[in-house]
Every structure is written in C-alpha cells, then in structure tokens.
C-alpha cells in the first residue's frame, strides 16, 4: 500500500539506519522456503535499484502491476504507471522478488543476465519503504503483488513472512499498512495470522470496481521490535 501522503512520482528519503543496513550481508542473503502447495521458492532481496534486475523480469512485473491497478480492487491508483516510474517506485529503495526454484538451480542472485520464463517462474514481489519522513521514518510500509499465475498457492503468506524477516533488518521498528480494503479478505487474514492488528479504519475510503458502495480502508499495524514471526493458524 502506498506510503501516507505519498506521490508515486516522488520518494520519501530513507532513514540513515536503512542506508547502513543495505550493506549488510544478512540483508542481501536470499531466503528459501516452501509454499502451502509444496513449491520451493527463493526470495531475492533487491538493494541496488531497478537497473540491477533482469529487464524482462521488470517488464513482466510492470505488466502485472498495471493489470492489478486496472482491475481497481486492491490499490488506490486509477491509472497504471509508466515503466520507468514503476521500476523506481517499486525497487528504488528495497524490494524482494519471489521466484520458483528449478531443480539443480544454484543461482544465488538475480543478475541482469538471468534468463527465466518469468511468467511461470516469478510468483510475486514486494517493496519496503518508510511510511513517514524524517523523525518518523523508522515506521515502514510495504506493497505486495502476487502474480496472476501464482494466486491461491500461499505466495502471499510466504511474502508476508519474508517481509517480517527483512523489515527489522532494514532498521524499521513498526509497520503500518494504510489502505487494506476491508473486502480484501485474503489479505486481512494473512496479516491477522502473522500477528498484525487493525489499528484504525477510514469509513468509505475507496471507490472500488468490485463494490457498488464505498469500501472501508483498514489501517493495519505491527510492532517489529523483538518479535518472531508467528503464524496463528
């Protein structure tokens, strides 16, 4: 979800702790996990901006995000971003890409030369950035996208757990999601299972394509200090 008061064409300056954390070897280490369907997945942290990604992958993710916006059900934007703007918006600070493992695959990073069938092998992505500027920049926000081919496989939960791994390593102390639309039941369930709480509500905040009446936006938060990831299910 977009950071509070954020114009997608601008960027809230990162906290100093984030700039230091981006050099950490633990932050740059991919995570390996398994979805509920038994698929092996690697989550690759992206710390060097959109140009460090394979451009076919970036274009695929741009197309997926554009389709999500045009669907009009989960993000507040009404028009898709241009390709260059998307790359900076999503990967300009810190992002993660979830990729299906291939048998015998020893690849430990996504280089600009990586060649994959991204439509089949890229499962999703998320970004992490400050939710507020300056003295409040230790509070973070994130945006998530599960690719169309990977839906209903538990990828959202995998990325949610990865978010709770990386966000504290980036120096963030608290997480806020500003606009989780109440009718996005799957998203709400994921965050509740991971120990998040509903800390606010904006009545009738969204005019969504999947509702004839305005939908409430939930503000969902979690303290990131000294807590392990707990799946409550």
Say what each PLM segment does:
Residues 125, 199-201:
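Residue-level detector of high-confidence beta-strand sites
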Residues 7-21, 25-26, 38-40, 194, ...:
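C-terminal "cap" of GNAT-fold acetyltransferases
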Residues 39-61:
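A short beta-loop-alpha structural element at the N-terminal edge
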Residues 154:
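Glycine-rich phosphate-binding loop
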Residues 163:
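Conserved alpha-helical elements of the SDR catalytic core
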Residues 167-180, 186-189:
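Conserved GNAT acetyl-CoA-binding A-motif
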Residues 73, 77-151, 160, 223:
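Acetyl-CoA-dependent GNAT
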């Amino acid at each position: 979800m977009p950071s509070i008061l954020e114009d997608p064409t601008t960027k809230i300056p990162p906290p100093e702790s984030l700039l230091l954390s981006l050099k950490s070897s633990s932050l740059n280490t991919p995570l390996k996990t398994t979805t509920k369907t038994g698929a092996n997945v690697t989550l690759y942290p992206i710390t060097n901006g959109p140009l460090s990604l394979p451009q076919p992958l970036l274009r695929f993710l741009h197309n997926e995000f554009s389709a999500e916006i045009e669907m009009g059900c989960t993000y507040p934007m009404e028009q898709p971003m241009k390709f260059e703007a998307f790359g900076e918006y999503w990967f300009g600070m810190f992002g993660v890409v979830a990729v299906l493992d291939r048998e015998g695959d020893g690849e430990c990073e996504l280089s600009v030369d990586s060649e994959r069938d991204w439509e089949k092998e890229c499962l999703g992505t998320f970004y992490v950035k400050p939710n507020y500027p300056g003295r409040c920049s230790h509070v973070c926000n994130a945006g998530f996208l599960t690719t169309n081919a990977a839906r209903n496989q538990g990828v959202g939960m995998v990325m949610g757990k990865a978010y709770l791994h990386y966000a504290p390593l980036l120096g963030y102390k608290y997480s806020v999601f500003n606009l989780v639309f109440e009718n996005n039941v799957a998203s709400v369930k994921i965050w509740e299972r991971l120990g998040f709480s509903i800390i606010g509500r904006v009545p009738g905040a969204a005019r969504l394509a999947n509702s004839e009446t305005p939908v409430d936006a939930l503000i969902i938060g979690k303290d990131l200090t000294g807590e392990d990831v707990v799946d409550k299910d």
